[in-house]
Amino acid sequence: TDYTLANGTLTISAGSTSGTITIGSIVDDSLDEANETVIVTLSSPSNATLGSDDAHTYTITDNDSAPVVDFNTTSSNGAESTSSKALTVDLSAASAQDVTVDYAVTGTATGSGTDYTLANGTLTISAGSTSGTITIASIVNDSLDEANETVIVTLSSPSNATLGSDSVHTYTINDNDNAP
């Protein structure tokens, strides 16, 4: 609950022209969230007529910073025989909103199933969560003697978050084949 206010009756004393309804105890939480509204509606007056302005909307403006999104490590490696690699993307704090971040895939390894499978995309970290995973899948254990190859994943264009300094992760596929 972000505030306290119960249904009730407003009494305007004889001779007065106004009364006050107090929204009490607005909670200053630390959760990044959208602005929220409280709508107070007047109804069923006695000894008076209800005017056209029978509702008031009060906006609780969120004052919390959006979380930072970035990789929890900037590099990792594994042998060709590793079938997949999960890259963890972290938020600095949970958010009350879904966070999305785009990612682009580059590097010296060839995607589309030749060396691995992972296309450019968008990661969604659900509201309340603090991390998500991008998976480099189907890492191919070929029999070619070749140099180690890299898969570079770069984060960009977050929504409901700001981009952190660790926005690039380099995964190295270590060749495990002997020279002919």
Regions found by a protein language model. Name each.
Residues 1-180:
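Short boundary segments that mark the start of a structured unit
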